A protein has these predicted regions:
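Compact nucleic-acid interaction/catalytic patches
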Residues: 3-10, 15-51
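C-terminal terminal-subdomain/extension
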Residues: 52-108
Length: 108
């Protein structure tokens, strides 16, 4: 169930979890998409995907709307985004989560 500004209903998502996690975990991490690109406030956490990527409409990746989903909830693969799009999305995820280089540390 969605409350307030949370995204509800069946919608496309971008899988943002790394490939190793996707291979071994029963869950995956996703960012929600919205086709209401003109009604959305353009936040620094938003990335506009152009038409022609297998989506019906231009869509906004909302990197502040990150979810963990059981893989069984994924209906079908629509497309694979190239590295350029994923770099833009990665940058916005870092903004959303306030991940700065000085905050990242290795664990033993």
């Amino acid at each position: 169930d969605a409350n307030g500004s949370e995204q509800g209903k069946v919608r496309p998502v971008v899988v943002i979890q790394n490939n190793r996690g996707n291979k071994y975990s029963p869950t995956t991490i996703v960012a929600c998409l919205s086709s209401k690109v003109y009604s959305k406030h353009h936040l620094p956490t938003h990335y506009l995907l152009p038409e022609g990527l297998g989506l019906k409409y231009k869509s906004m990746v909302m990197c502040e709307q990150i979810r963990v989903l059981d893989k069984s909830r994924l209906i079908k693969k629509i497309t694979k985004l190239d590295k350029r799009h994923m770099m833009h999305i990665d940058r916005r995820i870092k903004i959303s989560l306030d991940l700065k280089q000085q905050h990242l540390h290795s664990r033993k």
